[in-house]
Structure formats: structure tokens, C-alpha cells
């Protein structure tokens, strides 16, 4: 993946407002790569410090991140992001639209 793609990912993620989330696929589409969700995931695994990484979730609102998933959920709860009863983010309520 080119560094310019990763920079584009980081630029978009930095714009997601507190209390909102975006999906990996949504970010990929914004960058003109509608099938680039995995590339967005790769970029997010290497994101710079200070980027609100917790605001990027799966399209269905599932939280990823292995051992970091509980940290991600806690950070989103602090931002008052709503969750469904099954533990997924309520994408209908808080999905960011640029």
C-alpha cells in the first residue's frame, strides 16, 4: 500500500467528530477504493499516536481489535457512542457522514 493511501486514511479519521464512527469500507470509498476496507484496516494498525482510532469500526458496527476491543469500546462509551444490545455500535444513530 502506498504511503499516500495511508495518509489519506489518517486525514479522514482525524475529521471524524467525537461521538461518531465510520466504517473501514466507508473510509475506503471516500478515498476512491470501494473495495479497500482491508487496506484501511492495515493503515489503522499502523496509525500515528493521537489519531482517534477507536472511531473506525466494521460496517455492521462490530468492534475489532483483539485485545484492544475492550479499550475501543470504553473509549467510544466515553464519547457517548450508542451501542445495540448485542454490543455493536448503533450505526444508524452515529455513523459519520462527511
Where are the language model's segments positioned?
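Nucleic acid-binding interface residues in structured DNA/RNA-binding domains
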Residues: 1-98
Amino acid at each position: 500500500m502506498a504511503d499516500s493511501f495511508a495518509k489519506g486514511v489518517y486525514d479522514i479519521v482525524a475529521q471524524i467528530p467525537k461521538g461518531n464512527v465510520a466504517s473501514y469500507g466507508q473510509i475506503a470509498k471516500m478515498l476512491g477504493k470501494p473495495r479497500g476496507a482491508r487496506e484501511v484496516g492495515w493503515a489503522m494498525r499502523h496509525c500515528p499516536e493521537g489519531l482517534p482510532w477507536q472511531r473506525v469500526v466494521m460496517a455492521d458496527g462490530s468492534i475489532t481489535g483483539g485485545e484492544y476491543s475492550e479499550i475501543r469500546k470504553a473509549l467510544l462509551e466515553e464519547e457517548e457512542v450508542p451501542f445495540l444490545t448485542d454490543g455493536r455500535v448503533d450505526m444508524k444513530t452515529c455513523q459519520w457522514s462527511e
